[in-house]
UniProtKB/Swiss-Prot annotation:
PANTHER family according to UniProt: 3-OCTAPRENYL-4-HYDROXYBENZOATE CARBOXY-LYASE-RELATED (PTHR30108), FERULIC ACID DECARBOXYLASE 1 (PTHR30108:SF17)
Catalytic activity entry: a 4-hydroxy-3-(all-trans-polyprenyl)benzoate + H(+) = a 2-(all-trans-polyprenyl)phenol + CO2
GO process terms (BP): ubiquinone biosynthetic process
Name of the protein in question: 3-octaprenyl-4-hydroxybenzoate carboxy-lyase
Length: 493
Protein backbone atom coordinates (compact mmCIF):
# COMPACT_ATOMS: atom_id res chain seq x y z
CA UNK A 1 0.00 0.00 0.00
CA UNK A 2 1.30 3.47 -0.90
CA UNK A 3 0.28 6.81 0.59
CA UNK A 4 0.08 9.94 -1.55
CA UNK A 5 -0.35 12.24 1.43
CA UNK A 6 -0.01 12.38 5.19
CA UNK A 7 -3.78 12.18 5.72
CA UNK A 8 -4.16 8.83 3.98
CA UNK A 9 -1.39 7.44 6.18
CA UNK A 10 -3.08 8.84 9.30
CA UNK A 11 -6.31 7.09 8.28
CA UNK A 12 -4.44 3.83 7.69
CA UNK A 13 -2.75 4.03 11.09
CA UNK A 14 -6.03 4.79 12.84
CA UNK A 15 -7.77 1.87 11.13
CA UNK A 16 -5.00 -0.43 12.37
CA UNK A 17 -4.95 0.82 15.95
CA UNK A 18 -1.68 2.69 15.44
CA UNK A 19 -2.97 6.24 16.02
CA UNK A 20 -4.77 7.84 18.95
CA UNK A 21 -6.74 11.08 18.73
CA UNK A 22 -6.37 13.32 21.80
CA UNK A 23 -9.37 15.64 22.20
CA UNK A 24 -8.33 16.98 25.62
CA UNK A 25 -6.57 20.38 25.36
CA UNK A 26 -2.79 19.92 25.49
CA UNK A 27 -0.21 22.72 25.47
CA UNK A 28 2.54 22.65 22.78
CA UNK A 29 4.73 24.21 25.48
CA UNK A 30 6.30 21.14 27.18
CA UNK A 31 3.08 19.14 27.69
CA UNK A 32 3.07 17.52 24.23
CA UNK A 33 6.67 16.42 24.71
CA UNK A 34 5.93 14.77 28.05
CA UNK A 35 2.92 12.91 26.66
CA UNK A 36 4.67 11.84 23.45
CA UNK A 37 7.75 10.71 25.39
CA UNK A 38 5.72 8.51 27.75
CA UNK A 39 3.79 6.99 24.85
CA UNK A 40 6.90 6.32 22.77
CA UNK A 41 8.71 4.62 25.66
CA UNK A 42 5.66 2.39 26.06
CA UNK A 43 5.81 1.55 22.31
CA UNK A 44 2.44 3.27 21.93
CA UNK A 45 0.61 4.79 18.95
CA UNK A 46 1.06 7.95 16.94
CA UNK A 47 -0.78 10.90 18.50
CA UNK A 48 -3.04 13.51 16.93
CA UNK A 49 -3.59 16.39 19.36
CA UNK A 50 -6.86 17.85 18.11
CA UNK A 51 -7.07 20.78 20.53
CA UNK A 52 -3.63 22.29 21.13
CA UNK A 53 -3.81 25.10 23.67
CA UNK A 54 -3.84 28.49 21.94
CA UNK A 55 -4.29 27.09 18.44
CA UNK A 56 -6.92 25.46 16.23
CA UNK A 57 -4.47 23.51 14.06
CA UNK A 58 -4.09 19.83 15.11
CA UNK A 59 -0.59 18.55 15.92
CA UNK A 60 0.61 15.13 14.77
CA UNK A 61 3.32 13.59 16.97
CA UNK A 62 5.09 10.26 17.44
CA UNK A 63 4.37 9.35 13.81
CA UNK A 64 7.50 7.18 13.42
CA UNK A 65 7.65 6.21 17.09
CA UNK A 66 8.06 2.48 16.38
CA UNK A 67 10.04 0.65 13.67
CA UNK A 68 6.76 -0.99 12.65
CA UNK A 69 5.20 2.37 11.72
CA UNK A 70 8.29 3.27 9.69
CA UNK A 71 7.83 0.02 7.77
CA UNK A 72 4.10 0.69 7.37
CA UNK A 73 4.87 4.10 5.85
CA UNK A 74 6.81 2.29 3.12
CA UNK A 75 4.07 -0.27 2.55
CA UNK A 76 5.75 -3.00 4.60
CA UNK A 77 4.40 -4.79 7.66
CA UNK A 78 7.72 -5.90 9.16
CA UNK A 79 10.84 -3.73 9.65
CA UNK A 80 12.97 -6.63 8.35
CA UNK A 81 11.24 -6.16 4.99
CA UNK A 82 13.01 -2.80 4.75
CA UNK A 83 16.07 -4.76 3.61
CA UNK A 84 14.36 -4.80 0.21
CA UNK A 85 14.74 -1.02 0.17
CA UNK A 86 18.41 -1.44 1.03
CA UNK A 87 18.84 -3.91 -1.83
CA UNK A 88 17.31 -1.36 -4.20
CA UNK A 89 19.65 1.35 -2.93
CA UNK A 90 22.65 -0.96 -3.25
CA UNK A 91 21.65 -1.60 -6.86
CA UNK A 92 21.26 2.12 -7.56
CA UNK A 93 24.64 2.94 -6.03
CA UNK A 94 26.47 0.31 -8.10
CA UNK A 95 24.25 -1.16 -10.83
CA UNK A 96 25.71 -4.32 -12.33
CA UNK A 97 25.25 -5.14 -16.04
CA UNK A 98 23.26 -8.35 -16.67
CA UNK A 99 25.46 -11.45 -16.85
CA UNK A 100 23.13 -13.10 -19.33
CA UNK A 101 19.54 -13.36 -20.50
CA UNK A 102 18.21 -14.91 -17.29
CA UNK A 103 19.99 -12.29 -15.21
CA UNK A 104 18.53 -9.53 -17.39
CA UNK A 105 15.04 -10.96 -16.85
CA UNK A 106 15.60 -11.04 -13.09
CA UNK A 107 16.52 -7.34 -13.12
CA UNK A 108 13.34 -6.27 -14.93
CA UNK A 109 11.46 -5.43 -11.68
CA UNK A 110 14.21 -2.99 -10.68
CA UNK A 111 14.24 -1.42 -14.15
CA UNK A 112 10.45 -1.02 -13.96
CA UNK A 113 10.81 0.69 -10.60
CA UNK A 114 13.32 3.09 -12.10
CA UNK A 115 10.65 4.28 -14.54
CA UNK A 116 8.72 5.70 -11.57
CA UNK A 117 11.58 8.00 -10.60
CA UNK A 118 10.89 11.40 -12.24
CA UNK A 119 8.51 13.54 -10.14
CA UNK A 120 5.21 14.58 -11.68
CA UNK A 121 4.43 18.32 -11.79
CA UNK A 122 0.80 19.14 -10.98
CA UNK A 123 -1.30 22.30 -10.87
CA UNK A 124 -3.85 23.34 -8.24
CA UNK A 125 -1.87 21.50 -5.59
CA UNK A 126 -3.51 20.85 -2.20
CA UNK A 127 -0.58 22.52 -0.41
CA UNK A 128 -1.53 25.84 -2.04
CA UNK A 129 -5.23 25.89 -1.19
CA UNK A 130 -4.57 28.79 1.23
CA UNK A 131 -1.92 31.43 0.45
CA UNK A 132 -0.58 34.00 2.93
CA UNK A 133 1.82 36.82 2.09
CA UNK A 134 2.95 40.12 3.55
CA UNK A 135 1.55 40.93 6.99
CA UNK A 136 -0.45 37.68 6.98
CA UNK A 137 2.79 35.70 7.33
CA UNK A 138 2.96 34.86 11.03
CA UNK A 139 4.84 31.78 12.19
CA UNK A 140 3.71 32.34 15.78
CA UNK A 141 0.22 31.25 14.71
CA UNK A 142 1.51 27.73 14.06
CA UNK A 143 1.38 25.32 17.05
CA UNK A 144 5.17 24.94 17.11
CA UNK A 145 6.34 22.79 20.02
CA UNK A 146 8.52 24.15 22.81
CA UNK A 147 9.99 20.79 23.74
CA UNK A 148 12.16 21.12 26.86
CA UNK A 149 12.37 23.56 29.81
CA UNK A 150 15.84 24.77 28.82
CA UNK A 151 15.02 25.35 25.15
CA UNK A 152 15.46 28.96 24.10
CA UNK A 153 12.33 29.09 21.86
CA UNK A 154 9.81 26.92 19.99
CA UNK A 155 11.42 24.65 17.40
CA UNK A 156 10.32 23.43 13.96
CA UNK A 157 11.51 19.82 13.84
CA UNK A 158 9.99 17.87 10.92
CA UNK A 159 10.36 20.40 8.11
CA UNK A 160 11.73 19.13 4.80
CA UNK A 161 14.12 21.85 3.68
CA UNK A 162 14.28 22.05 -0.12
CA UNK A 163 17.31 23.59 -1.81
CA UNK A 164 19.12 23.54 -5.14
CA UNK A 165 22.76 24.28 -5.81
CA UNK A 166 23.89 26.08 -8.98
CA UNK A 167 26.00 23.08 -9.99
CA UNK A 168 23.34 20.45 -9.26
CA UNK A 169 20.62 19.22 -11.59
CA UNK A 170 18.62 17.76 -8.74
CA UNK A 171 17.01 19.40 -5.72
CA UNK A 172 18.07 18.38 -2.24
CA UNK A 173 15.73 17.52 0.63
CA UNK A 174 17.06 17.61 4.17
CA UNK A 175 15.67 17.79 7.69
CA UNK A 176 17.23 20.55 9.79
CA UNK A 177 15.83 21.96 12.99
CA UNK A 178 14.67 25.58 12.81
CA UNK A 179 14.42 27.94 15.78
CA UNK A 180 11.52 30.38 15.81
CA UNK A 181 13.13 33.83 15.79
CA UNK A 182 10.31 36.17 14.75
CA UNK A 183 6.93 36.18 13.02
CA UNK A 184 8.67 35.69 9.67
CA UNK A 185 12.08 34.33 10.63
CA UNK A 186 13.59 30.96 11.52
CA UNK A 187 17.20 29.98 12.16
CA UNK A 188 18.31 27.28 9.72
CA UNK A 189 20.59 24.93 11.65
CA UNK A 190 22.38 22.94 8.99
CA UNK A 191 25.90 21.59 9.45
CA UNK A 192 28.56 22.27 6.83
CA UNK A 193 28.56 18.75 5.35
CA UNK A 194 24.78 18.52 4.88
CA UNK A 195 23.23 18.85 1.43
CA UNK A 196 21.42 22.13 2.06
CA UNK A 197 24.53 23.80 3.49
CA UNK A 198 26.64 22.60 0.54
CA UNK A 199 24.07 23.95 -1.94
CA UNK A 200 24.06 27.29 -0.09
CA UNK A 201 27.87 27.42 -0.10
CA UNK A 202 27.99 26.83 -3.87
CA UNK A 203 25.33 29.51 -4.41
CA UNK A 204 27.25 32.10 -2.37
CA UNK A 205 30.41 31.42 -4.37
CA UNK A 206 28.64 31.83 -7.71
CA UNK A 207 26.24 34.64 -6.72
CA UNK A 208 27.95 36.57 -3.90
CA UNK A 209 25.63 38.75 -1.83
CA UNK A 210 22.42 37.48 -3.45
CA UNK A 211 19.45 36.03 -1.56
CA UNK A 212 19.23 32.24 -1.66
CA UNK A 213 15.74 30.75 -2.29
CA UNK A 214 14.66 28.13 0.25
CA UNK A 215 11.40 26.26 0.82
CA UNK A 216 10.36 24.16 3.83
CA UNK A 217 7.59 21.55 3.57
CA UNK A 218 5.75 20.47 6.72
CA UNK A 219 3.53 17.40 6.73
CA UNK A 220 4.67 15.86 3.45
CA UNK A 221 3.61 12.32 2.55
CA UNK A 222 5.43 9.71 4.67
CA UNK A 223 7.42 8.22 1.80
CA UNK A 224 8.91 11.59 0.84
CA UNK A 225 9.74 12.29 4.50
CA UNK A 226 11.57 8.97 4.82
CA UNK A 227 13.29 9.52 1.48
CA UNK A 228 14.91 12.59 3.04
CA UNK A 229 16.53 10.53 5.84
CA UNK A 230 17.61 7.57 3.68
CA UNK A 231 21.14 7.24 2.18
CA UNK A 232 20.08 8.14 -1.36
CA UNK A 233 22.90 8.29 -3.97
CA UNK A 234 24.23 11.85 -4.31
CA UNK A 235 23.21 12.01 -7.96
CA UNK A 236 19.56 11.15 -7.22
CA UNK A 237 16.78 13.43 -6.00
CA UNK A 238 14.89 12.38 -2.88
CA UNK A 239 11.71 12.93 -4.92
CA UNK A 240 12.89 10.35 -7.43
CA UNK A 241 13.74 7.89 -4.69
CA UNK A 242 10.35 8.45 -3.04
CA UNK A 243 8.76 7.58 -6.37
CA UNK A 244 10.73 4.34 -6.45
CA UNK A 245 9.59 3.40 -2.96
CA UNK A 246 5.98 4.35 -3.60
CA UNK A 247 5.78 2.64 -6.97
CA UNK A 248 4.43 5.79 -8.60
CA UNK A 249 5.79 9.23 -9.32
CA UNK A 250 5.94 11.87 -6.58
CA UNK A 251 3.51 14.75 -7.16
CA UNK A 252 5.25 18.12 -6.94
CA UNK A 253 4.26 21.68 -7.73
CA UNK A 254 6.23 24.86 -8.34
CA UNK A 255 6.60 27.13 -5.34
CA UNK A 256 4.89 30.52 -5.59
CA UNK A 257 7.95 32.67 -4.97
CA UNK A 258 10.73 30.70 -6.72
CA UNK A 259 11.44 27.81 -9.09
CA UNK A 260 11.84 25.16 -6.39
CA UNK A 261 9.44 22.22 -6.50
CA UNK A 262 7.56 21.21 -3.35
CA UNK A 263 5.65 18.04 -2.39
CA UNK A 264 2.18 18.85 -3.73
CA UNK A 265 0.22 17.14 -0.95
CA UNK A 266 2.14 18.71 1.95
CA UNK A 267 0.13 20.20 4.79
CA UNK A 268 2.12 23.45 5.05
CA UNK A 269 4.77 25.15 2.89
CA UNK A 270 7.09 27.93 4.06
CA UNK A 271 8.72 29.89 1.22
CA UNK A 272 11.42 32.50 1.49
CA UNK A 273 15.13 33.15 1.31
CA UNK A 274 18.41 33.24 3.20
CA UNK A 275 20.40 36.46 3.13
CA UNK A 276 24.07 35.38 3.23
CA UNK A 277 24.84 38.31 5.54
CA UNK A 278 22.16 37.50 8.13
CA UNK A 279 23.18 35.09 10.88
CA UNK A 280 21.79 34.53 14.38
CA UNK A 281 22.74 32.70 17.57
CA UNK A 282 20.93 29.34 17.68
CA UNK A 283 20.11 27.35 20.80
CA UNK A 284 20.47 25.97 23.33
CA UNK A 285 18.14 23.02 22.68
CA UNK A 286 17.69 19.59 24.17
CA UNK A 287 18.88 17.13 21.56
CA UNK A 288 18.96 13.41 20.70
CA UNK A 289 22.02 12.99 22.91
CA UNK A 290 19.95 13.65 26.02
CA UNK A 291 21.75 16.94 26.71
CA UNK A 292 21.32 20.60 25.83
CA UNK A 293 23.74 21.59 23.09
CA UNK A 294 26.00 24.62 22.78
CA UNK A 295 24.91 27.74 20.94
CA UNK A 296 26.36 28.80 17.60
CA UNK A 297 25.57 31.09 14.69
CA UNK A 298 23.57 29.82 11.70
CA UNK A 299 21.82 31.43 8.70
CA UNK A 300 18.42 33.11 9.14
CA UNK A 301 15.57 31.90 6.92
CA UNK A 302 13.15 34.76 6.15
CA UNK A 303 9.65 33.50 5.30
CA UNK A 304 7.83 35.54 2.65
CA UNK A 305 4.94 33.15 1.89
CA UNK A 306 3.02 30.52 3.84
CA UNK A 307 0.74 28.20 1.89
CA UNK A 308 -1.23 25.33 3.33
CA UNK A 309 -4.10 22.92 2.90
CA UNK A 310 -7.52 23.71 4.27
CA UNK A 311 -7.75 22.34 7.82
CA UNK A 312 -3.98 21.80 7.83
CA UNK A 313 -2.23 19.45 10.26
CA UNK A 314 1.08 20.45 11.88
CA UNK A 315 3.60 17.55 12.01
CA UNK A 316 6.03 17.74 14.93
CA UNK A 317 8.36 15.74 17.14
CA UNK A 318 10.86 16.15 19.96
CA UNK A 319 14.39 14.85 20.42
CA UNK A 320 15.86 13.70 23.71
CA UNK A 321 17.74 10.88 25.38
CA UNK A 322 17.01 7.64 23.51
CA UNK A 323 14.57 6.18 22.90
CA UNK A 324 13.08 9.05 20.94
CA UNK A 325 11.62 9.25 17.44
CA UNK A 326 15.00 9.65 15.67
CA UNK A 327 16.25 6.58 17.56
CA UNK A 328 13.26 4.54 16.35
CA UNK A 329 13.90 5.75 12.81
CA UNK A 330 17.48 4.60 13.24
CA UNK A 331 16.35 1.11 14.28
CA UNK A 332 14.25 0.84 11.12
CA UNK A 333 16.86 2.37 8.81
CA UNK A 334 19.36 -0.10 10.24
CA UNK A 335 17.73 -2.75 8.04
CA UNK A 336 18.24 -0.57 4.96
CA UNK A 337 21.95 -0.20 5.69
CA UNK A 338 22.62 -3.97 5.88
CA UNK A 339 22.29 -4.77 2.13
CA UNK A 340 24.17 -1.58 1.17
CA UNK A 341 27.14 -2.57 3.33
CA UNK A 342 27.00 -6.19 2.17
CA UNK A 343 27.18 -5.05 -1.45
CA UNK A 344 30.59 -3.54 -0.73
CA UNK A 345 31.67 -6.05 1.94
CA UNK A 346 30.01 -9.45 1.31
CA UNK A 347 31.69 -10.87 4.41
CA UNK A 348 29.39 -8.79 6.64
CA UNK A 349 26.80 -11.02 8.33
CA UNK A 350 24.86 -8.34 10.20
CA UNK A 351 25.09 -4.71 11.21
CA UNK A 352 23.56 -3.01 14.24
CA UNK A 353 23.20 0.58 15.38
CA UNK A 354 22.08 0.30 19.02
CA UNK A 355 19.41 2.96 19.66
CA UNK A 356 20.88 3.76 23.07
CA UNK A 357 23.99 4.87 21.15
CA UNK A 358 22.08 7.91 19.83
CA UNK A 359 21.29 6.11 16.54
CA UNK A 360 24.70 6.34 14.89
CA UNK A 361 27.47 6.93 17.46
CA UNK A 362 28.15 3.21 17.92
CA UNK A 363 27.96 0.33 15.44
CA UNK A 364 28.40 -3.41 15.96
CA UNK A 365 29.24 -5.54 12.91
CA UNK A 366 29.45 -9.32 12.66
CA UNK A 367 31.64 -10.74 9.89
CA UNK A 368 32.71 -14.01 8.33
CA UNK A 369 36.38 -13.59 9.14
CA UNK A 370 38.69 -14.81 6.37
CA UNK A 371 42.21 -13.60 7.20
CA UNK A 372 44.28 -11.83 9.88
CA UNK A 373 43.49 -8.13 10.12
CA UNK A 374 40.12 -8.60 8.45
CA UNK A 375 38.23 -6.88 11.28
CA UNK A 376 40.29 -3.71 10.87
CA UNK A 377 39.57 -3.58 7.14
CA UNK A 378 35.83 -3.75 7.78
CA UNK A 379 35.85 -1.08 10.49
CA UNK A 380 37.81 1.31 8.24
CA UNK A 381 35.41 0.58 5.40
CA UNK A 382 32.33 1.22 7.52
CA UNK A 383 33.64 4.61 8.61
CA UNK A 384 34.34 5.69 5.04
CA UNK A 385 31.70 4.00 2.87
CA UNK A 386 28.54 5.94 3.78
CA UNK A 387 28.31 9.57 4.85
CA UNK A 388 25.86 8.48 7.56
CA UNK A 389 28.72 6.82 9.49
CA UNK A 390 31.07 9.79 9.39
CA UNK A 391 30.17 10.56 13.01
CA UNK A 392 30.18 6.98 14.33
CA UNK A 393 32.61 7.10 17.27
CA UNK A 394 32.80 3.40 18.13
CA UNK A 395 32.78 0.33 15.88
CA UNK A 396 32.89 -3.18 17.34
CA UNK A 397 33.64 -6.13 15.04
CA UNK A 398 32.60 -9.64 16.11
CA UNK A 399 32.59 -13.10 14.53
CA UNK A 400 29.58 -14.68 12.85
CA UNK A 401 28.92 -16.87 15.91
CA UNK A 402 28.12 -13.72 17.91
CA UNK A 403 24.72 -12.03 17.65
CA UNK A 404 25.74 -8.41 17.14
CA UNK A 405 22.28 -7.24 18.32
CA UNK A 406 22.57 -9.02 21.69
CA UNK A 407 24.68 -7.16 24.23
CA UNK A 408 25.15 -10.38 26.24
CA UNK A 409 26.90 -11.90 23.23
CA UNK A 410 28.82 -8.74 22.33
CA UNK A 411 30.15 -8.11 25.85
CA UNK A 412 31.20 -11.78 26.09
CA UNK A 413 33.14 -11.42 22.83
CA UNK A 414 34.79 -8.16 23.95
CA UNK A 415 35.91 -9.56 27.28
CA UNK A 416 37.14 -12.94 25.97
CA UNK A 417 38.49 -12.20 22.45
CA UNK A 418 40.09 -8.78 22.89
CA UNK A 419 43.40 -7.56 24.20
CA UNK A 420 42.87 -3.85 24.92
CA UNK A 421 46.17 -2.73 23.38
CA UNK A 422 46.45 -5.07 20.39
CA UNK A 423 42.79 -5.04 19.37
CA UNK A 424 41.87 -1.39 19.85
CA UNK A 425 42.30 1.08 16.98
CA UNK A 426 42.38 4.79 17.85
CA UNK A 427 42.13 7.46 15.15
CA UNK A 428 42.55 11.11 16.06
CA UNK A 429 41.32 14.33 14.41
CA UNK A 430 38.34 12.88 12.57
CA UNK A 431 34.94 14.48 11.84
CA UNK A 432 32.65 14.33 14.86
CA UNK A 433 29.08 15.48 15.39
CA UNK A 434 29.03 19.14 16.33
CA UNK A 435 26.59 18.25 19.14
CA UNK A 436 29.17 15.91 20.71
CA UNK A 437 30.51 18.04 23.55
CA UNK A 438 32.75 15.15 24.68
CA UNK A 439 35.12 15.82 21.77
CA UNK A 440 38.05 18.15 22.53
CA UNK A 441 37.23 20.47 19.62
CA UNK A 442 33.77 21.16 18.17
CA UNK A 443 33.33 18.99 15.09
CA UNK A 444 36.68 17.21 15.46
CA UNK A 445 37.50 14.23 17.66
CA UNK A 446 38.69 10.64 17.79
CA UNK A 447 37.25 7.27 16.85
CA UNK A 448 37.72 3.84 18.43
CA UNK A 449 37.58 0.50 16.67
CA UNK A 450 37.37 -2.73 18.70
CA UNK A 451 38.35 -6.06 17.15
CA UNK A 452 36.40 -8.60 19.22
CA UNK A 453 36.91 -11.46 16.75
CA UNK A 454 38.77 -14.72 17.33
CA UNK A 455 42.45 -14.14 16.61
CA UNK A 456 44.23 -16.00 13.84
CA UNK A 457 47.86 -17.04 13.41
CA UNK A 458 49.79 -13.86 12.91
CA UNK A 459 47.53 -11.97 15.30
CA UNK A 460 48.52 -13.98 18.39
CA UNK A 461 51.19 -16.47 19.50
CA UNK A 462 48.82 -18.10 22.01
CA UNK A 463 46.73 -21.22 21.58
CA UNK A 464 43.23 -19.83 21.08
CA UNK A 465 40.33 -20.99 23.21
CA UNK A 466 37.61 -23.30 21.88
CA UNK A 467 34.05 -22.26 22.81
CA UNK A 468 32.14 -24.69 25.02
CA UNK A 469 29.21 -26.22 23.13
CA UNK A 470 26.95 -28.98 24.43
CA UNK A 471 26.61 -32.19 22.41
CA UNK A 472 23.61 -31.81 20.09
CA UNK A 473 22.31 -35.34 20.74
CA UNK A 474 22.27 -34.67 24.48
CA UNK A 475 20.34 -31.43 23.95
CA UNK A 476 17.72 -33.25 21.89
CA UNK A 477 17.46 -36.01 24.52
CA UNK A 478 16.84 -33.45 27.29
CA UNK A 479 14.25 -31.71 25.12
CA UNK A 480 12.26 -34.94 24.88
CA UNK A 481 12.26 -35.64 28.63
CA UNK A 482 11.97 -32.06 29.89
CA UNK A 483 8.26 -32.20 30.69
CA UNK A 484 8.85 -35.35 32.78
CA UNK A 485 11.45 -33.66 34.98
CA UNK A 486 8.94 -31.56 36.89
CA UNK A 487 10.92 -28.37 36.30
CA UNK A 488 9.17 -25.14 35.40
CA UNK A 489 9.34 -23.72 31.87
CA UNK A 490 12.66 -24.29 30.15
CA UNK A 491 14.74 -21.19 29.60
CA UNK A 492 14.88 -19.99 26.01
CA UNK A 493 18.30 -20.58 24.46
Amino acid sequence: MSFKDLRSFISHLEANGELKRISHPVDPHLEMTEIADRVLRAKGPALLFENPVGNEMPVLANLFGTPKRVAMALGKEDPLALREVGELLAFLKEPEPPRGFKDAISKIPMFKQALNMPPKTVRNAPCQEVIKTGSDVDLTKLPIQHCWPGDVAPLVTWGLTITKGPRQKRQNLGIYRQQLLDKDKLIMRWLDHRGGALDFKDFKEKFPGERYPVVVALGADPVTILGAVTPVPDSMSEYAFAGLLRGERTDVCKAISCDLEVPATSEIILEGYIDPEEMAEEGPYGDHTGYYNETDKFPVFTVTHITHRKDAIYHSTYTGRPPDEPAMLGVALNEIFVPILRKQYPEIIDFYLPPEGCSYRMAVISIRKEYPGHAKRVMMGAWSFLRQFMYTKFIIIVDEDVNCRDWNDVIWAITTRMDPKRDTVMIENTPIDYLDFASPVAGLGSKMGMDATNKWEGETDREWGTPIVMDEAVKQRIDTIWDDLGIDDAPTL
